[in-house]
From Swiss-Prot:
Pathway: Cofactor biosynthesis; thiamine diphosphate biosynthesis; thiamine phosphate from 4-amino-2-methyl-5-diphosphomethylpyrimidine and 4-methyl-5-(2-phosphoethyl)-thiazole: step 1/1. Its EC number is 2.5.1.3. It is an enzyme of class 2 (transferase). Disulfide bonds: none annotated. This is Thiamine-phosphate synthase. 2-[(2R,5Z)-2-carboxy-4-methylthiazol-5(2H)-ylidene]ethyl phosphate binds at T138, N139, T140, G170, I190, S191. GO terms for biological process: thiamine biosynthetic process; thiamine diphosphate biosynthetic process. One of its GO terms (cellular component) is cytoplasm. It comes from Oceanobacillus iheyensis (strain DSM 14371 / CIP 107618 / JCM 11309 / KCTC 3954 / HTE831). CDD domains: TMP_TenI (cd00564). Pfam families: TMP-TENI (PF02581). The gene is thiE. GO terms for molecular function: magnesium ion binding; thiamine-phosphate diphosphorylase activity.
Length: 206
């Protein structure tokens, strides 16, 4: 699947550990409501491992392809290869971008960036987009870093106007629009979908 920055507009991230009900049903509802990309992030307390993780990933990939949205895997290079995922998203503490790009020459690659130092040290020419944040404080990630705020999005867009950027961290239906107005190509979110009983309305407002 060829990358297009419009894929970032409503970027849903989820693993089974984020869900109070079947993640397959949540993804189906979110996909039919209009999310533009999905990242499978099976990490942290109560997350699946082994065969259970792989089987869920296969099901979620099939749902994504039914709705023609990219299926991206967080961090797990082996799983991304095994499932022939559309892309992989890596953090600063994961495998180096150069190594990942060699393994996935034609896949979508996203990179998390939280500081100017990380930005300056990253091979931006090898990634399709950057995930910037946390924009606001968040409780979803146990290892979340200090919030960077909207101003940093504006600064990044001035420095790298053609680099696709998706914001992450503390994003919900009440603040998503101001992030887009600040210059982000999209917003990514977890609990805004997994914690609501009204997925259609939430996706429309994100």
């Amino acid at each position: 699947m060829k990358f297009d920055k419009h894929m970032l507009r409503k970027y849903f991230i989820m693993g089974s550990q984020n869900c109070h009900r079947d993640p397959r049903e949540i993804l189906k509802e979110a996909a039919s409501a209009g999310i533009t990309a999905f990242q499978y992030r099976e990490k942290g307390k109560n997350s699946l491992t082994g065969t259970a993780k792989v089987e869920l990933a296969k099901d979620l990939k099939a749902i994504c392809h039914d709705f023609q949205i990219p299926f991206i895997i967080n961090d797990d290079v082996d799983l991304a290869k095994q499932l022939d995922a559309d892309g992989i998203h890596i953090g600063q503490d994961d495998q180096p971008v150069e190594v990942v790009r060699k393994q996935f020459p034609n896949k979508i690659i996203g990179l998390s960036i939280s500081t100017n130092n990380e930005l300056n040290q990253s091979p931006l020419d090898l990634v399709d987009y950057i995930g910037v944040g946390p924009i606001f404080d968040t409780n979803t990630k146990e290892d979340a870093k200090t919030a960077v705020g909207l101003e940093w999005i504006q600064s990044l867009k001035k420095q790298h106007p053609s680099l696709p950027l998706v914001a992450i961290g503390g994003i919900n239906t009440t603040n998503a629009q101001e992030i887009i107005q600040a210059g982000a190509d999209g917003v990514s979110f977890i609990s805004a979908i997994t914690e609501t009983d009204h997925i259609l309305q939430a996706v429309q407002r994100l």
